């Protein structure tokens, strides 16, 4: 039997970057060499959000996923994982692309933290105005 082909894809969100390796298998998901439940601290809603592209297509138990995530916090990393999985599944089976695109999983979320400006407390917060 020929070895299962592996597909790599990269996803990004805020300052997080996720690299996903996807191949046919039994549905095993590892993130940074840990099980996804351990890595995302067994938070069900966050785990479901991360694998939504696969659950949308009902292929969650048909592929093994190996993810490497760096940068940012939990929300950014989950968004990056979701983006990487959506890109990877579309590379494996191009017929999935319209459904994934319709849900907006292929779109890179451009929102980033606005930088702090000098003369202000934060990005937009200035000093309090005093009339007298």
Swiss-Prot record:
> What are this entry's molecular-function GO terms?
RNA binding; structural constituent of ribosome
Q: Name one Pfam family in it.
A: Ribosomal_S9
The alphabetized list of GO BP terms reads:
translation
Keywords of this entry: Ribonucleoprotein, Ribosomal protein
Quote the cellular component terms of the Gene Ontology held in the record: cytosolic small ribosomal subunit
Is Iron-sulfur found in the keyword set? Answer: no
- InterPro entries from the xrefs? Ribosomal_Su5_D2-typ_SF, Ribosomal_uS9, Ribosomal_uS9_bac/plastid, Ribosomal_uS9_CS, Ribsml_uS5_D2-typ_fold_subgr
UniProt-listed HAMAP family = Ribosomal_uS9_B (MF_00532_B)
What family is it from?
Belongs to the universal ribosomal protein uS9 family.
Q: Return the protein name.
A: Small ribosomal subunit protein uS9
Question: What organism does the record attribute this protein to?
Answer: Leptospira borgpetersenii serovar Hardjo-bovis (strain JB197)
């Amino acid at each position: 039997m020929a070895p299962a082909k592996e597909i790599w894809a990269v996803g990004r969100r805020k300052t997080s970057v996720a690299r996903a390796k996807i191949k046919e298998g039994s549905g095993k998901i590892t993130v940074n060499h840990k099980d996804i439940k351990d890595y995302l601290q067994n938070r069900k809603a966050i785990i479901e959000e991360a694998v939504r592209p696969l659950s949308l297509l009902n292929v969650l138990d048909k592929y093994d996923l190996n993810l490497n995530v760096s940068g940012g916090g939990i929300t950014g990393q989950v968004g990056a994982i979701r983006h990487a999985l959506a890109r990877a599944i579309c590379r494996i089976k191009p017929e999935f692309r319209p459904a994934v695109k319709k849900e907006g999983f292929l779109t890179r979320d451009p929102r980033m933290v606005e930088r702090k400006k000098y003369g202000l407390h934060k990005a937009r917060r200035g000093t309090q105005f005093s009339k007298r």
